[in-house]
A protein has these predicted regions:
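Basic/polar phosphate-binding segments, predominantly the helix-turn-helix DNA-binding elements
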Residues: 41-70, 94-115
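Terminal helix-turn-helix DNA-binding modules in bacterial transcription factors
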Residues: 62-99, 122-136
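A short, Lys/Arg-enriched amphipathic alpha-helix from helix-turn-helix/homeodomain DNA-binding modules
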Residues: 10-48, 69-87
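Basic, amphipathic alpha-helix used for nucleic-acid engagement in HTH/winged-helix/SANT-Myb modules
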Residues: 1-12, 56
Length: 136
């Protein structure tokens, strides 16, 4: 099996790191209300000055995951955090993440195995148990 030159391996790591940084910055901007639409792979490729297919293939080769994996994991991280805030409705959370309510529920359940409402109830119950154990 041929061995890839070290320069090529380094470039794959650089592209992957730049992509993950761009995803994190983009989601921070969406969460901060500075942008109201989610980027697609073409948008990230344009930011990194490379072809979308090259970006996708490079990330997949370097990490074993498609680019959408990193994007979706970051969205799930934000969704979980927001669901712990009882003052936010699920509709508000969906809108903040640029989903409509039903698509957000499907998206969340695909990754978490429960609906956003069920997740919220489970974590509210575990918070109450923790408070009781600590005598608060």
């Amino acid at each position: 099996m041929p061995v890839l030159p070290k320069k090529y391996q380094t470039r794959k790591a650089e592209i992957t790191a730049d992509f993950i940084t761009a995803v994190n910055e983009h989601i921070d901007q969406v969460m901060g209300g500075r942008i109201d639409k989610m980027y697609h792979i073409q948008d990230f490729a344009r930011l990194l000055f490379i072809h979308p297919v090259h970006l996708s293939n490079t990330i997949k080769l370097h990490t074993g995951h498609a680019p959408c994996y990193f994007f979706e994991m970051r969205l799930m991280e934000e969704a979980r955090k927001m669901l712990l805030d009882q003052t936010l409705t699920i509709t508000d959370i969906a809108a903040k993440l640029t989903f409509d309510n039903s698509n957000f529920t499907k998206f969340f359940k695909r990754f978490e195995g429960v609906t956003p409402s069920q997740y919220r109830l489970q974590h509210a119950a575990s918070s109450e148990v923790a408070l009781q154990v600590n005598g608060l």
